[in-house]
Design a protein with these regions (language model features):
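Catalytic cores of enzymes
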Residues: 1-227
Length: 227
């Protein structure tokens, strides 16, 4: 059940996300920790992007989203390295990473995100002094996890929740680069307008659905944790 995109379920007339806001619980204990933390306004954001020939729109995504936050930091390509990342993670409300991602089924703790100089693994994330309430992993397969005894998720989600995040936006499969840019623009515009995370993601998905009806394009991302 962990891999079912409930927001993309279709009843023959509509997809579930068209009629309701949907968020996913990471597990009772983790969710309790997420909901216990006081809410903060999303004022300071860190946008990190590493592009290449397979994901050429990452630069546009990173720079466009950063302009929505007057108090933001952008690390793009060469500056998006592990050292620079660790300088800023303790003093932000939002962390957005746009890059390549990979899930390691044989060892989920080595699932990772591609920075400019190295892969950022789950073990690395555990050691970050992360102060961001919202973490968006705009990459492939960032929401895929292995289910351990006790319904514990082993993967990137576990790392970022352990590091202190309250809400994660993750992906279930390989995402379409250009469509992801448009979805993220709409998502952050809705947040900036005061919408809840669940409402913002729903609006973004419905907007993409109008242009690209197939669920492959609009439904890979889902919200986990506080909504």
């Amino acid at each position: 059940m962990h891999y079912v995109p409930f927001h993309a379920l279709y009843d023959g007339f509509n997809y579930a996300i068209e009629n309701r806001e949907i968020a996913y619980a990471p597990g009772a204990g983790v969710l309790q920790n997420c909901l216990r933390k006081p809410r903060r306004p999303f004022e300071k954001a860190l946008f990190v992007g590493v592009s290449d020939e397979r994901i050429p729109f990452v630069g546009e995504e990173t720079k466009t989203l950063a302009r929505l936050f007057p108090n933001s930091i952008t690390l793009l390509d060469a500056s998006a390295n592990f050292g620079e990342l660790t300088k800023h993670t303790s003093d932000i409300d939002v962390l957005h990473l746009a890059c390549h991602g990979q899930f390691r089924a044989e060892n989920p703790l080595f699932s990772s995100l591609k920075l400019f100089d190295r892969w950022l693994t789950v073990r690395d994330v555990d050691s970050l002094k992360l102060n961001a309430d919202l973490v968006v992993l705009s990459a492939c397969e960032t929401g895929v996890s292995r289910i351990a005894p006790g319904d514990e998720l082993l993967g990137l989600a576990r790392g970022f929740f352990s590091a202190g995040a309250s809400s994660l936006v993750l992906s279930l499969w390989n995402v379409h680069d250009q469509t992801t840019v448009e979805l993220m623009k709409c998502f952050y515009r809705e947040i900036y307008a005061g919408k809840s995370l669940a409402a913002a993601l729903r609006r973004a998905q419905c907007e993409i659905m109008k242009k690209c009806p197939h669920p492959f394009f609009w439904s890979p991302f889902f919200l986990v944790g506080r909504w």
